[in-house]
Amino acid sequence: MTRTSKSREGKSSTRIGKARLAEMIEEATVDAYDESEQATGWFTMFEEHLELPFETKVLGTAVTVASIGLRGDYQIVAICTRGRDRQAISLVDLPLPSPKPAGAEWIEAYRHWLGGR
């Protein structure tokens, strides 16, 4: 279940229910028996569901999240660009814009999964 609520500032935010988070985690990690397979499962979910590119701010600077990458250490990163500059930022640390892009609930599920391992 996805819930939409209003913050004190009147902005809406979407929260995913625990049952839906569990379903998403299961979908991303089904048949994944090691860290490499789990990372590949999550990466696949982002490729299928996350609408790219999208704009956000990193340290107060506007950037474009152009793509998602998978590092050799199995860390999933957002490839952020600004002009000719590129920077990989962990999805765990990536600030999401408001409103969030379509598919951003997969980032929330990924963060939840990482916190529970």
Q: Predicted segment positions?
A:
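Mixed-charge, Lys/Arg-rich low-complexity intrinsically disordered regions
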Residues: T2-P53
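Short beta-rich binding modules
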Residues: R3-S5, R15, Q75, H112-R117
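Long, low-complexity intrinsically disordered regions
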Residues: S7-G10, A28-D31, A104-R117
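A short beta-strand micro-motif
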Residues: F54-V58
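Short beta-strand-centered aromatic/proline hotspots
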Residues: T61-G69
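Short aromatic-glycine-enriched beta-strand elements
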Residues: G72-I79
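A short macromolecule-binding patch
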Residues: D85-P95
